[in-house]
């Protein structure tokens, strides 16, 4: 069987109503040479019933437990057959039926292009979600711009990236997995583009809750820094993200979550140290020039 050019990959966890909207936004895509892959991140009867009704239109894998964002995406990568994998969160929708065609044009023009990130629009306000704009200052560029990371729930990735550098780090579960992959991709010579004209509508359904997020940020962001960045940058990342997680924990009444994240971060640092592969000087210079997450 000939492999499709594009695989649309959606990871879902107990959100069938939102998943239905995501799939409906994929179906009108103008590209014919495509497939749709859905990863059910832990058994959910309602979601599975919805997918059964779609029949062979969707390729489905059901994981025996919730493996997190990174583990779920890895399962989707394993099932997908396309040359380009277009990832969409289950509570998001493509806004343009030409999205895949436009993204393919970028990859066809540049053999070293590994990842294209999209602009995420808040479905309630109609404004850009600045927190996932892949630049430190969060300002929107006027056109297609080279970037140092990308929004994982609204992006397209060339399969060769995964073949070359491996999959997402499943141990991260949630938070920091895109940055980890970005640093490895950049260091392997792949380029990342951010195209603000390719947009995704995000409904912001409840995922990892406000009481849980401080744990993952406190644990994961220092790990990613320790694995890839110079030691002075590791110090600023660690202190900065621990402070941020504690502040967020205070606002959410979840200080204990942040403290547990700090505890588990420290406990896991010996393992991360053994995995440490700092990026090259060339990559560090690129991060400094292009608004990358070098110091925080």
Q: What is each residue range found by the language model?
A:
Residues 97-129:
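Conserved donor NDP-sugar-binding/catalytic core segment of glycosyltransferases
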Residues 85:
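Short aromatic/hydrophobic "clamp" motif used to bind/position activated sugar donors
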Residues 1-25:
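N-proximal low-complexity "stem/linker" segments adjacent to membrane-targeting elements
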Residues 149-157, 161-166, 171-199:
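A short, conserved alpha-helix in the catalytic core of glycosyltransferases
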Residues 63-80:
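Glycine-rich, basic loop-to-helix element that forms the pyrophosphate-binding segment
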Residues 122, 139-157, 179-180, 209:
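A recurrent flexible, glycine/aromatic-enriched loop bordering the glycosyltransferase active site
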Residues 23-62:
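Acidic donor-binding segment of Leloir-type glycosyltransferases
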Residues 233-296:
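Non-catalytic, C-terminal membrane-associated alpha-helical segments of glycosyltransferases
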